[in-house]
Amino acid sequence: MNDRGDPRSVRAGLADVDGSIDGLVMNAGGMGGKTPMALTADGATYIFAQNVLGHVVLLEALLAEDRLGEVAVFAGSEAARGIPKMGFKRPSFDSNSADELATVIDGSYFAGGKPDVNLAYGQAKLIGILWMAHLARQHPDRRFICMSPGNTTGTQAPNDLALPLRMAAKYVMPRVPGLSHKLDVGAKRLVDGVTDPTLSSGVFYASAANTLKGPAVDQTDIFPDLANQSLQDHANEAIHRLITQKTPA
């Protein structure tokens, strides 16, 4: 067991694993607990560290040691392209620069105002998805799939949401057509990410626009910025500024 928000814990856990890993599913994440915008010892917000930072350390260590067999799957979220009906704005940036993306990681994006935790979650997922697309271009011999499990009932994911949205997620959305599906459906999406050879490396798959269930589709048609290679590279750079400077082994 290790804490995906703590790079040192991830490295220690990986040292205990022998051999290669045929398929890696990076599903840990969430809304950052009770203090999502507080900073970890590494200088990242808890919500970013929980959703992205440890996964970066884990996957890139496996790649560096040539221990990833074939495929890595990162659990994305429709929040990365916006969920207006649930109060998640689509992430957007003024410059798309590494400097600007780095402000998401350290929380200074919201300096001088009240943080929007829903937006911060979508931003974190988006940066993780862009990083995976960057890796897909660097490692064409392996598959890097981003897959949202969709709005899945029966998990602990809503526990960190604000009370009104938490109550809606637990008791209202499961009864509204088009807003959620059962746990086994969400789990199957992640399994498909590992096993379905028709899924394209570097692509983010999630529910169609304006829904949170149903078939998983390529999100690039909904949010073209996902295919922006410069933005992908800037996301990778922003992440590694923190990892290189603040997370020694």
Q: What spans do the regions from the language model cover?
A:
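Alpha-helical membrane-targeting segments
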Residues: 109-116, 151-185
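Rossmann-fold NAD(P)H-dependent dehydrogenase/reductase core
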Residues: 1-153, 244-248
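Short, flexible, mixed-charge acidic loops at enzyme active sites
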Residues: 88-91, 159-166, 209-210
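C-terminal helical subdomain
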Residues: 171-220, 229-230, 237-245
